[in-house]
């Protein structure tokens, strides 16, 4: 499970777990995580959040050689979580979670379950760059392309650790024959060579992406458990 140097491990976990497994996951939570779990009013949202957090602790524990309950998760200045000895990022949508792992570079992950009712054209005009909009509107399957791009852009924000403090129109991503690439990012002169973008196919209709700080990287997709 632990990534090799120069490798990004992308772990896909199902979130509709049995009551027994969810109870075992909850037993690994900190007081802060337990409070967050019970704060959800909707049972499905509560259980899926708990399963995502539990899967994260299981995966981190497996990679670090620790029990899930012993993994100490800390938070950076922009709220990005981290642990000693491993870089990671978590995203979840619908009934799936995506966990990106690395031993030597910052990573960001995003997974999305495309929703038919979302007004994707309006969202694109608001949040994408002019170049991204032009390529999106020229694509054959505009809705599918929208979610592919959305995942890549979200993953970049999470890789930099800036989150919502950076505008989604302050950087541009382009799809290529072999995947995707970052063209530019305001405030990061070497952005195009500094970050690698990896669109992923997690299956079951989901879209996903991982962005990592570094070049010459490889990805490995893993199903959990």
Where is each model-derived feature located?
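Core catalytic alpha/beta fold that binds nucleotide/phospho-ligands
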Residues: 1-225
């Amino acid at each position: 499970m632990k990534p090799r140097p120069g490798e990004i491990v992308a772990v896909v976990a199902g979130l509709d777990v049995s009551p027994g497994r969810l109870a075992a996951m909850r037993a690994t939570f900190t007081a802060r995580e337990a409070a967050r779990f019970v704060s959800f009013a909707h049972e499905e949202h509560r259980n899926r959040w708990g399963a995502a957090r539990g899967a994260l602790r299981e995966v981190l524990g497996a990679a670090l050689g620790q029990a899930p309950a012993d993994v100490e998760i800390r938070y950076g200045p922009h709220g990005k979580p981290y642990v000693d000895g491993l870089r990671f990022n978590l995203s979840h949508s619908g009934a799936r979670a995506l966990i990106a792992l690395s031993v030597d570079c910052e990573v960001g992950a995003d997974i999305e379950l495309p929703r038919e009712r979302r007004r994707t054209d309006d969202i694109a005009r608001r949040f994408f760059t002019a170049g991204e909009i032009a390529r999106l509107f020229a694509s054959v399957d505009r809705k599918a392309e929208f979610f592919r791009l959305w995942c890549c852009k979200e993953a970049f924000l999470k890789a930099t650790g800036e989150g919502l403090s950076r505008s989604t129109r302050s950087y541009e991503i382009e799809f290529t024959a072999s995947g995707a690439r970052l063209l530019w990012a305001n405030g990061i002169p070497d952005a195009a060579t500094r970050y690698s973008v990896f669109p992923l196919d997690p299956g079951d209709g989901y879209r996903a992406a991982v962005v990592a700080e570094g070049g010459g990287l490889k990805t490995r997709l893993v199903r959990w458990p």
